[in-house]
Amino acid sequence: MDAIKKKMQAMKIEKDNALDRADAAEEKVRQITEKLERVEEELRDTQKKMTQTGDDLDKAQEDLSAATSKLEEKEKTVQEAEAEVASLNRRMTLLEEELERAEERLKIATEKLEEATHNVDESERVRKVMENRSLQDEERANTVEAQLKEAQLLAEEADRKYDEVARKLAMVEADLERAEERAEAGENKIVELEEELRVVGNNLKSLEVSEEKALQREDSYEEQIRTVSSRLKEAETRAEFAERSVQKLQKEVDRLEDELVHEKERYKTISEELDSTFQELSGY
């Protein structure tokens, strides 16, 4: 009987222990269930976050693609601006060379103008000399005429001096003839000089017209250079603006890349937490 009682007591103790173990097991199951529910809730939240992260990643990739397209467009704009600047530089070089040639032609025209002016001055001097000579010849002719009259008076007054007067008269007539010839030659020379002066004047007018045209072309070249300089400045401004835009886009791309790396790290961390939770559940 004692053995039965002891056995019953032992069984009761074992029953109590079993009940305690059962309660403990139920509590542990409840805790595990709650933890599992929390894990499932966290898993659902994580899945939502992953979905949102995927959407954000897609959006980031779309933004990156758009930024890349904009960057390519800006690079194309900068290349076009640089090409335009190079073209303008070549054109400006050609204009400078043409301006140098125009200045050289203007210099030659100026030298010719100075030479023509010198020739006109020389012609004027020669003309004045010939006029003075003509006046001298006329004065000599007047003197000869006076001498002739005096000789005629002397001839009328004194026949005995007729031969001497006749000889003097012949000499005077010869001098008069030579004077008339010189006067005629002087007049012809004056006509020639006047014609030469007219030709020189026409050449001078032609040179003045050429100089005026050269000045007009020079003004046109200067205006073209100012226009090219203005366009060059605008192109430089456009290039600087494009460069600043490229820098801003590059910063935006760098920021998106950093965000992408950060999201990948978050995804990796969440995956590691899920793996750890599943391992803990498997251990129970």
UniProtKB/Swiss-Prot annotation:
Q: Let me know which tissues express this protein, per UniProt.
A: Isoform a and isoform d are expressed in body wall muscles, vulva, anus muscles and male tail muscles. Located to the myofibrils of thin actin filaments.
Q: Does the keyword Cytoplasm apply?
A: yes
Report the superkingdom from the record. Answer: Eukaryota
In terms of one coarse class, where is the protein primarily found?
cytoplasm
> Segment Disordered: which positions?
40-78
Outcome when changing residue 222 to K: In lev-11-rg1; disrupts most steps of male mating behavior except spicule insertion
Effect of inactivating the gene: Worms have 50-75% embryonic lethality. Those that survive body wall interference have abnormal body morphology and uncoordinated movements, and those that survive pharynx interference have deformed pharynges and gut regions. RNAi-mediated knockdown results in a wavy appearance of the actin filaments in adult body wall muscles.
GO annotation, biological process: actin filament organization; locomotion; muscle contraction; negative regulation of actin filament depolymerization; regulation of actin filament polymerization; regulation of muscle contraction; spicule insertion
- Cytoplasm recorded as keyword: yes
One GO cellular component term of this record is: striated muscle thin filament
Keyword annotations for this protein?
Actin-binding, Coiled coil, Cytoplasm, Muscle protein
Q: Which InterPro entries match?
A: Tropomyosin (IPR000533)
**Location of this chain's protein in the cell:** Cytoplasm; Cytoplasm, Myofibril, Sarcomere, I band
Parts forming coiled coils:
1-284
Q: Name one GO molecular function term.
A: actin filament binding
Which cysteines bridge via disulfide bonds?
none
Q: What does the domain comment read?
A: The molecule is in a coiled coil structure that is formed by 2 polypeptide chains. The sequence exhibits a prominent seven-residues periodicity.
Describe the family membership recorded for this protein in Swiss-Prot or TrEMBL.
Belongs to the tropomyosin family.
Function, in words = Tropomyosin, in association with the troponin complex, plays a central role in the calcium dependent regulation of muscle contraction. Involved in muscle actin filament organization and muscle arm extension and morphology. Protects actin filaments from depolymerization by unc-60 in vitro. Also has a role in male mating behavior by regulating the copulatory spicules. Binds to F-actin.
Q: Which PANTHER family match?
A: TROPOMYOSIN (PTHR19269)
The entry's protein name is Tropomyosin isoforms a/b/d/f
- Organism, by scientific name, is Caenorhabditis elegans
What does the record give as the organism's lineage?
Eukaryota, Metazoa, Ecdysozoa, Nematoda, Chromadorea
